[in-house]
Amino acid sequence: MPEAKPAAKKASKGKDAPKEAPAKQTPEEPPKEAPPEDQSPTAEEPTGIFLKKPDSVSVETGKDAVILAKVNGKELPGKPTIKWFKGKWQELGSKSGARFIFKESHDSTSNVYTVELHIGKVVLGDRGDYRLEIKAKDVCDSCSFNVDVEAPRQDSSGQSLESFKRSGDGKSEDAGELDFSGLLKKREVVEEEKKKKKDDDDLGIPPEIWELLKGAKKSEYEKIAFQYGITDLRGMLKRLKKAKVEVKKSAAFTKKLDPAYQVDRGNKIKLVVEISDPDLPLKWFKNGQEIKPSSKYVFENVGKKRILTINKCTLADDAAYEVAVQDEKCFTELFVKEPPVLIVTPLEDQQVFVGDRVEMSVEVSEEGAQVMWMKDGVEMTREDSYKARYRFKKDGKRHILIYSDVAQEDGGRYQVITNGGQCEAELIVEEKQLEVLQDIADLTVKAAEQAVFKCEVSDEKVTGKWYKNGVEVRPSKRITISHVGRFHKLVIDDVRPEDEGDYTFVPDGYALSLSAKLNFLEIKVEYVPKQEPPKIHLDCSGKTSDNSIVVVAGNKLRLDVAITGEPPPTATWLRGDEVFTATEGRTHIEQRPDCSSFVIESAERSDEGRYTIKVTNPVGEDVASIFLRVVDVPDPPEAVRVTSVGEDWAILVWEPPKYDGGQPVTGYLMERKKKGSQRWMKINFEVFTDTTYESTKMIEGVLYEMRVFAVNAIGVSQPSMNTKPFMPIAPTSAPQHLTVEDVTDTTTTLKWRPPDRIGAGGIDGYLVEYCLEGSEEWVPANKEPVERCGFTVKDLPTGARILFRVVGVNIAGRSEPATLLQPVTIREIVEQPKIRLPRHLRQTYIRKVGEALNLVIPFQGKPRPQVVWTKGGAPLDTSRVNVRTSDFDTVFFVRQAARSDSGEYELSVQIENMKDTATIRIRVVEKAGPAENVMVKEVWGTNALVEWQPPKDDGNSEITGYFVQKADKKTMEWFNVYEHNRHTSCTVSDLIVGNEYYFRIFSENICGLSDSPGVSKNTARILKTGITLKPLEYKEHDFRTAPKFLTPLMDRVVVAGYTAALNCAVRGHPKPKVVWMKNKMEIHEDPKFLITNYQGILTLNIRRPSPFDAGTYSCRAFNELGEALAECKLDVRVPQ
């Protein structure tokens, strides 16, 4: 298909033109849309968000094209989404092929985004209109440009530069003499061009201006003529009228491929071309490689059509296709569009520690789909993954982002975007906090016994050191330090008095220490008389006051009380007033001769109270009391609830716990999660002391749950009950463009537009309020919200000046009000009455009998005008005509029109002494009556003159013509003679001699032909003359011919299981006998084959062919004069 050349390119053929001057450097020819000299080009003016729009380009085939645009980031609320389109909707992306490269860059200093589209090795299929679309939240803008693809360019004179040669062997460009012999071979071409140039210059207009005029619109002729100084406008127009665009028609193709096709992935597509000769060989190519028939690519021949069917299109089929017939080719490009990829399982918020392994996964609807990961609005690519310690993984429909060793800077908001949806989640990375699961306890041991300090921390990998009175403890024969899992032990064998002191365990890398005291119980041997009263030696560490001990719930408590006396006393323990004697269980007593121990394996709140030990012997008794106080983590907070929500925040309120664990509550910790998720996210890391907290950074429209922990010196409580699910939503923005539509003496009609931002909460309606000027009290005009963007406020005081405002209402509450800038005076404005007569009623309005008459005529005027209809000065007949009048229009209605409804109707609209009138002319028509007095006036030869008179009833419409028919008296079959005959007479010719004819006439008007015709009262008799016929003698022609195939059999490739047909056409007389054969074996009465012969068109239908049916088929036709044979090959392919 020939391509149109730009005018600038033809202008370079002048005598003094440079040989390789590019088209854009031709100063005499600006483009068609070039602005006047006093204006700057529109492409350089910043329009909307574009600082520089993409320019239309013209590229030679096989070269690269670059399109550049710049976007003002100051006009955008965030990072823009950039899309390129070919045509109107065909989106270009990573699936468009490797030839399309998209680049984006951002200059942070000037806040300018630069976008580029690179098209490599341009082909003819790239020609067309393109569109660039920029979108950022609610801001969207687009602009279009064109890419024109040309054939490779020669030098400016139309000849190859190789025509100029230099004689000699010198390598220098100036060596030797110029040899112009190459030009002599194309002298005729040069002379033709000179002659053409002379013809173009006969008006003194350069050829490039003619090319510009040929491509311009007619409305731009005068502007171009004025711009280039052309004064002979009449001659210029005559010349343009004579100029004809020669379109070179294709010799091989009668219908070519479209420039581009688009198909969804998984579907099939048919590429159809039509060739001029069905016998021409045809080949299909994909990216330059010939396509062979297969189950994927199916070739079909239907007449002159050649069809390529591509089944189950994949992204590999996204390519350039061409079809070649002899030396001619046509091209197209196929774009395979992926279905929208939906997000099935979104990302979930995660809270991890530094060094942990993190996997953020999302599940999409399509396997192998492309997704884009973003962190804090910046795209994450595989190229950057080597520097940033992350990697991507695909597992079927799941896409996973993996951090093997997460760092604190990896925290942030992560987003996954597909072409059908997006989701986001937050990753919080915090420093590891070591949790003490079991603290070390104070010990009291005797000499030569073993002392064991044991603690448990949350991290198995944490190491630490033991200190005694600030000095590090080193292992020795008596001292053993061990670390097994989360447990750390310090074991001291054969305890000595110098081992007494404060022992501390300090984990490495944490500002944490665990301390306990080792008390050495020294046994002194003294001389005691044989009888000594019992004595209690009470010395327990951990007491806060005299005889008071504090223990943490869950820890072990052992009270070793030394007793003396002679004879050895008996010890009794009491809890409150009850004697405690258990020797086994969680709480029990251990008795030794010189010591009585009270042991609690795991302290509970119920163990708190006063404990008494009483020792007795015959000499006396001794009593000591100990108050045990058990401290614990507090109870969970109560009455946790969300009191209010916003666009991305919520207010959380709770009550302090009833039981504080024996220690004052120091603060609270909060957590939240999305409803349905199992992952809780910490909101605060430092304790929060108040009971009201504002949680932020939530996603509007997502359901959340929250819970609260209480914290005291002992630890963190159990979580509270979850709040009811809540959704962060915000009121809408203020309604827009509030205006006054109408004002009367007591009402005001307002209208507005919906808010710019509605949000996830939607909008339930609008509330209208008004306030008298000078007052600050706003009065609601409607109790229930109105859904439409308009409202009439009624019962207003006449003459008052009132301000109005409108607020949007949704589940989150009221929006900001939209208020009128000026107060409105409540007084109706008198407007002169005016009838707005529709255009079709300004002329006679014609309807047919029986049809409905429904006329709607709008008018204006305030207050409501008085409307009066009359016909000929008299009131209308209300039994036939219905009239309905509103504030803005009047309706004239007749259910079934009759001819009596025709006439002139007057409509008047009056307000006080002001009046406007209009006249409506109505004509009701029907079919006309038959023609009158149809007579045959004269007969001569085979002609007859018929005349008639117009019908008495014209159906209230002009007679537009007559319909004339004739009939032979013998058969009385009527035949048409004339249609739309305008006159009341006609001459009927070519009548048959010897016959007698009748004639009938139908009248015709706007409704059609009359129901009955007017029939001629007399007949036209065509008499015979005395001419005798002498037949000529001739030799009878011999019509017998031998069989000959007009259309031969064609080789076929069919798909197994689908019925196939072999067709050919044969001619012969007498009618030849036809025999079908397969592999030279005659096909008999086989139900698999159906043979038909319709007027020489022979068809062999093969029902559901299989590979066994493949072979050579032949058709043999023979009669007494000879025979003919046609053969073809049938190939049956099995779908893969």
Curated annotation (Swiss-Prot):
Task: List the residue ranges of the region (Disordered).
Answer: 1-55, 151-177
Single GO term (MF): structural constituent of cytoskeleton
Give the compositionally biased regions (Basic and acidic residues): 13-35, 163-174
Pfam families in the cross-refs: fn3 (PF00041), I-set (PF07679), THB (PF18362)
| SUPFAM superfamilies documented for this protein | Fibronectin type III (SSF49265), Immunoglobulin (SSF48726)
Limits of the Ig-like C2-type domain = 46-149, 250-339, 340-432, 433-533, 534-633, 833-927, 1043-1136
One GO biological process term is: muscle contraction
For this protein, the record's InterPro entries field holds: FN3_dom (IPR003961), FN3_sf (IPR036116), Ig-like_dom (IPR007110), Ig-like_dom_sf (IPR036179), Ig-like_fold (IPR013783), Ig_I-set (IPR013098), Ig_sub (IPR003599), Ig_sub2 (IPR003598)
Asked whether the keyword Repeat is assigned, the reply is yes
Q: What residues does the Fibronectin type-III domain cover? A: 636-732, 734-829, 930-1025
How is this protein annotated for GO cellular component? cytoskeleton; myosin filament
PROSITE patterns under this entry? FN3 (PS50853), IG_LIKE (PS50835)
Please tell me whether the keyword GTP-binding is annotated for this protein. Answer: no
Purpose of the protein? Thick filament-associated protein located in the crossbridge region of vertebrate striated muscle a bands. In vitro it binds MHC, F-actin and native thin filaments, and modifies the activity of actin-activated myosin ATPase. It may modulate muscle contraction or may play a more structural role.
Name under which the protein is recorded:
Myosin-binding protein C, fast-type
Task: List the gene name.
Answer: Mybpc2
